[in-house]
Amino acid sequence: ILLAACCMVACRYQSASPSVSLPEIKSDSTNPQSWAYFLQHLPQSKGNILDYQGRPIVNQEKHFALINYDVGTKDLQQCADALIRIRAEYLFSQKRFDEIGFHFTNGTFYSWDAWCRGFRPVFAKPGGRQSFMEAALLREKTHASLRSYLNVVYAYAGTVSLCKELQSADRLDIGTVVIYPGHPGHCSLIVDRGVLDGKDT
């Protein structure tokens, strides 16, 4: 199953489970603390795919399942942003707060810890590197503050910066990102695999 811009692209199986794993396919057994297990058990929602304004999108036929994530009220979460969001949600769920951080397209690294300490990006000139100014009050490391931090990341990160952060994979597996960096680029994330009739699916 591929996660692409918040849609699960796969054959249209009928799923009765609360997660996004395929019901007819025996999935791999993974460590409950692992990235793969987290992806296999993303919360599923029923109903239509909605845009950031709460309106059903036109095409409701290109997905297998719908993740039950609130995307907020701004048009910020595109394909790379969705992957950034899910990775951050995983690290948050594991309480690995110090590992949450992403590069902007121009190469500047910005961590959630810096955001919580009040540092905000400042642009000296268009296309230049950011400096950071202590311009806000300290924030606790809560899920609400994570969402606010990610809104900043979405604005300045994308497939180009995400591609530079990733390592090449020898094989496709759960958690593998398939990415085409560019302006625009695109990326997808494998969230499950299994065995059907003795073959990898």
Language-model features and meaning:
Residues 9-10:
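C-terminal motif of bacterial Sec signal peptides marking the signal peptidase cleavage site
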Residues 13-61, 65, 70-78:
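N-terminal module-boundary/linker segments of secreted carbohydrate-active enzymes
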Residues 73-166:
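Extracellular-facing segments of soluble proteins and assemblies that are Gly/Ser/Thr-biased and enriched
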Residues 166-173:
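Short, well-ordered loop/turn sites that connect or cap secondary structure elements
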Residues 179-187:
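Short coil-to-beta-strand transition motifs
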Residues 199-201:
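Short solvent-exposed strand/turn elements
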